[in-house]
């Protein structure tokens, strides 16, 4: 009888424990997705600003200026404003340097000013008309006259589960644009590299948007054409085709010229090259990270908003 009572007592206890465990499991927070970009991809890429730059706070000196004129992470620098101008101890600023006007390489439209991001600094002491700051992150060397703008914390968009690339689809019909520049002016671009696109908030683009990178079939591959003086003729080499560029090593003629076939054919699928995600946006241009590729990407390749 005692065993029966003991069993009856234990059943509710076990039920309570199981229910409690279930409640705790339901309340356990899910881990947040990891940011898709490194901090250097967020703070060191630079950007194209359509609006004129107006910062008046700048670097005017350094603790070690008698021995060097370029400053980096850990160096102490002096700013041209202080307590009287509203600068506060502990404030963090981006260090920036405008480099010049950017034009669209294909339409020649003015896109704005390219601004190089040099790093971050924190104000550690404030005087009446000057401030002392320490460079906490350096992407490039900091020099006299470099400008400052207030820091806003941003870790970049979150990653998402990989989806199949639409290798042969007709597209989504979404917003279309073009890659207009690459970081460090690379000609051939691969995954995990930074590019700049000709779409921004004006076109409804937001950080975290994914775009498919593609190229129209028939468009020349690579970034340069072969000059005419390097083109061989059949008279030089004895090949049946009138001219060749060594493309597929074909030496036999066909019944119909390739140009005629292309001219008269229906629209064929585009060549999908990869995918990119938007990291930072301005009014008419954005900074993006190429997440994956199926082939080398070039400046000038087309993009379309993915689903």
Functional labels for PLM-detected ranges:
Residues 1-12:
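Bacterial N-terminal signal peptides that target proteins for export
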Residues 2, 22-307:
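Surface-exposed, polar/charged interaction patches used for macromolecular assembly or partner binding
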Residues 10-20:
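Bacterial N-terminal signal peptides
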